Design a protein with these regions (language model features):
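Short, electropositive alpha-helical surface patch
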Residues: 51-54, 87-102
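Active-site mouth of glycoside hydrolases
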Residues: 1-75, 79-82, 86-87, 207
């Protein structure tokens, strides 16, 4: 959430204007989006309408007014996820972020219960490649329960999630090399399962994976590690 005083709105307006003029001619640009998950998190945590959210006018009035004047060609979406329902992450309209799977400890096979119209964010964690880890991780730390190894997963209970979902589908190996391979394989199975389900579900018009890459050697949602492997 952000303030809506005159000075801050003026600063936002200038920043939006400069960046729209800078980026609007890129051929890969499909849509402008006001924010990431602000309305959704407000609705979840405050149990009230996102229209009461501090900063609401920035996304629903200020930014669209600027775009109308300098780039009316590209569509604008106030937030992601967002739709016409009270719940910004509803299956009934707009787009969704599917984080019941993984973040809320739900197995990826439960994707069959997802009725999204368009999934603009979903993902599943796996470790970086063995060669990438070996560049920074001494032999003494190459253990799945080692604190240095676990430090390179920044989600709360991220390593525990990897183990839980791995145990549901593949053998649990305590040997470090085998663990890396099987955890990567399970990440691939998870993404494949979700993508194939949404491709065959006529209600779902598309899905976007979070995320393509990462900036350091880590276990994360990335499918390409920091060494581009």
């Amino acid at each position: 959430s952000y303030p809506e005083n005159d000075d801050f709105i003026a600063n936002v307006s200038e920043e939006v204007t400069q960046n729209v003029l800078r980026l609007q001619h890129h051929v890969c640009l499909a849509i402008w989006c006001g924010n990431n998950e602000n309305e959704w998190i407000w609705h979840q945590e405050q149990k009230s309408s996102y229209k009461k959210m501090p900063g609401y006018n920035i996304y629903h009035k200020v930014i669209p007014a600027i775009l109308k004047n300098i780039d009316a060609m590209h569509p604008y979406w106030q937030s992601t996820p967002f739709g016409n329902d009270e719940d910004p992450n509803s299956f009934e309209s707009g787009n969704t972020h599917q984080w019941n799977i993984w973040s809320r400890w739900i197995d990826y096979t439960e994707v069959v219960n997802d009725k999204s119209l368009f999934v603009t964010e979903f993902g599943f964690q796996g470790p970086a490649n063995k060669d990438t880890f070996e560049k920074y991780l001494p032999i003494k730390n190459r253990n799945i329960s080692d604190q240095v190894f676990e430090h390179h997963n920044k989600q709360v209970e991220g390593p525990e999630r990897i183990i839980k979902f791995l145990s549901a589908h593949l053998p649990i190996k305590t040997e470090w090399n085998e663990y890396l391979y099987l955890a990567q394989l399970n990440q691939a199975f998870a993404l494949k399962t979700c993508l194939e389900y949404w491709r065959t579900n006529k209600k779902t018009n598309g899905s976007i994976i979070w995320q393509i890459n990462d900036c350091w050697p880590v276990s994360s949602w990335a499918i390409v590690d920091s060494d581009t492997k």
